A protein has these predicted regions:
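Cytosolic regulatory regions of ion transport systems
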Residues: 1-462
């Protein structure tokens, strides 16, 4: 065993199998939430590196072994998460944990064949969740490509509301505008809930003055969001075609979603066997068996005229260089997939288009689930996103019972600083609240804040 046993009485007992990119991201997020974590992996060096960095226990061994799970404390575990690179091992781990413990189980399953059978696997193996980082990352990329001028598009309220991140261009209508004047000069159906300026994140008040170069996150319905973008002079049309470099699982999931949206897709992959498999799974895509890191190959594939470029080679350095090249040689919307944290500080200073960290897409979903199990029965967390490099959170709460926040005018309640209620969803209606609005039982409420660790809607109160 590596690490020191540190029982945090308020936290859950969590076992994580797999110390790769996803497992490490889960440790990073969940350790910061105050849980008791035991990490299992066959690689002693990986275990030691993580236990040196975080206050967690580490165990070297096979997570599918009953004996190893017993040593890890399966009898007292509340949650068991298997996120190795092997779908079969993850399912075996969860099966053993479910039979021998009383914990909730979550498995990573990323193979397309298994992913299509997720409902069957959950039911028959008693899994609480099946997670697929590649598929979820593809959904994020697909949403972002639906609005090419956006740096990020997130979905809330079962698709009724979007949170969209854009950078204010020089000379734009918003440059120099106070947020309180937005309704008078542009629209009333948009809430600007977070702003990043010169590396600092703000939850803006009505008196906050927007500036060119600001990164803003705003919330609106899909229709109103596009209307707002048109009014401020930004294009909202869908891309026509996309070029993907790399033929892995994430490329398959992304191409499948783009083709379904009517977008022409080309994939460059150097491995002939992968090309053959992709041509069968994606008959409407153009599959090119060549080296996508070769400048001439990219030119022949039409990089100069393509509308979207997404490098998914599996190697961060290649993806970054390809994105920089595409930004220089084309007008394409560029999305850069980054797997590791090593480059995070550098990546944030580079013009790489929209940057996606797949491991954090999944870890946000699991953190939301864990917080929902930890909180009171008065509400549940439905959706959680870390935004602006985890310096702020966007949380969607479902209010299930009367509490200190229900039945009162918002203007009569005192909220924590750096917090904004972005919307209230009541039945199928979206309300962008003012001071006279109230929160009712049955509502979904979205909160954006630079405070961290909210588990319950009542945490918004000062």
């Amino acid at each position: 065993m590596f690490g020191n046993k540190n029982n945090k009485k308020s936290g859950m007992n969590i076992i994580i199998v797999g110390c790769g990119k996803v497992g490490s991201a889960l440790v990073e997020r969940l350790a910061g939430e105050g849980h008791n974590i035991t990490l299992i992996d066959k690689d002693a060096a990986k275990i030691q590196a993580v236990t040196n960095m975080y206050d967690v226990m580490g165990l070297v061994g096979n997570g599918g072994s009953y004996g190893v799970q017993v040593e890890a404390g399966i009898d007292t575990a509340d949650l068991f998460i298997a996120v190795t690179d092997s779908d079969e091992l993850n399912l075996l781990c969860c099966t053993v944990a479910k039979r021998e413990g009383k914990c909730v189980t979550i498995a990573r399953v990323h193979t397309p064949e298994y992913s299509k059978e997720a409902g069957f696997l959950k039911e028959k193996l008693g899994l609480e969740m099946i997670i697929n980082p590649e598929y979820e990352a593809a959904k994020v990329m697909s949403r972002t490509l639906s609005l090419p001028m956006a740096e990020e598009v997130s979905s809330f309220a079962h698709g009724q509301v979007e949170m969209i991140k854009i950078r204010i261009p020089e000379g734009n209508t918003l440059d120099g505008m106070k947020i309180k004047d937005l309704g008078r000069d542009v629209t009333t159906n948009v809430v600007i809930c977070a702003v990043e300026r010169e590396g600092e994140v703000f939850i803006p008040s009505g008196m906050f003055i927007l500036r060119a170069g600001d990164l803003i996150s705003f919330v609106a319905t899909r229709k109103d969001a596009r209307g707002f973008l048109k009014k401020i002079g930004l294009k909202t049309g869908q891309i026509r075609d996309a070029l993907i470099v790399g033929g892995g699982k994430d490329a398959y999931y992304l191409a499948e979603q783009l083709i379904r949206a009517g977008i022409e897709v080309s994939i460059i992959e150097r491995n002939a066997d992968k090309c053959e498999a992709l041509s069968i799974m994606l008959p409407k895509a153009v599959i090119i068996n060549d080296d996508g890191t070769n400048e001439e190959v990219l030119k022949e594939a039409g990089l100069h005229n393509i509308q979207a470029f997404i490098p998914l080679t599996g190697i961060d350095e290649e993806n970054i260089i390809l994105s920089l090249y595409a930004k220089r040689m084309s007008e394409a919307k560029v999305i850069t997939r980054v797997s590791r944290n090593n480059f995070k500080s550098i990546v944030n200073t580079m013009d790489l288009g929209s940057v996606i960290f797949p491991k954090y897409v999944i870890s946000d979903a699991i953190v939301a689930y864990v917080r929902a199990r930890m909180n009171s029965m008065d509400c549940n967390i439905e959706t959680l996103y870390h935004i602006f490099g985890s310096r702020a959170e966007a949380i969607e709460f479902m209010v299930e019972n009367e509490s200190a926040v229900t039945g009162k005018k918002l203007s009569d309640m005192k909220f924590k600083n750096n917090l904004r209620i972005a919307y209230i969803r009541r039945k199928n209606n979206i309300i962008f609240p003012g001071g006279d609005d109230e929160i009712h039982v049955g509502d979904s409420v979205m909160v954006v804040t630079t405070n961290t660790g909210f588990q319950d809607i009542q945490d918004i109160l000062a």
